[in-house]
A protein has these predicted regions:
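Phosphate-handling substructures
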Residues: 75-142
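Active-site-proximal alpha-helix that buttresses catalytic centers in soluble enzyme cores
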Residues: 2-84, 137-140
Length: 143
């Protein structure tokens, strides 16, 4: 029986000058540095025999993840074309979206953030909902 290997890649740095917890919010794209990170990751994956034979590329529908996945897809497809293989297409899947978070859209750092206000620390330390909104069971059920 042939083994299947799944590689998980986190998105590059996000342009977020207001330090908002963006979670599932639209409109949060890669920063210039994030694009360079995605391109460097793409080059690495395309150059490695262990990863450049990918059969599929999946991404959540979030802007930053699609941008990162697209950089990887472009590099892998260049390698595939050099081997006369069919190009891959990006598959987006809502089930692999980031975990839900009760602090979505708020500032959470720099001392004045939502984590430190109105007893919110109790939410942060709840081990049954480590993402402060969506439990491990909920995540497992959707994935």
């Amino acid at each position: 029986m042939q083994a299947t290997t799944i590689h998980f890649v986190r998105h590059g740095e996000v342009h977020n000058p207001d330090h908002i917890l963006y979670e599932r919010l639209p409109g949060f794209h890669l920063s210039d540095r994030g694009r360079r990170m995605a391109e460097a990751t793409a080059r690495y994956l395309a150059a490695s025999p262990q990863t450049n034979t990918a059969a599929a590329i999946y991404s959540s529908p979030l802007d930053r993840t699609r941008e990162t996945a697209q950089a990887i897809l472009t590099a892998l497809n260049e390698t595939r074309m050099a081997r006369n293989e069919e190009p891959l297409e990006l598959v987006t899947d809502q089930r692999i979206i980031e975990a839900g978070n009760n602090f979505r859209g708020t500032r959470i750092g720099h001392g004045e953030g939502a984590l430190w206000r109105n007893g919110n620390w109790k939410i942060v330390t709840n081990l049954w909902k480590p993402s402060w909104g969506e439990s491990y069971r909920q995540i497992a059920a959707r994935v």
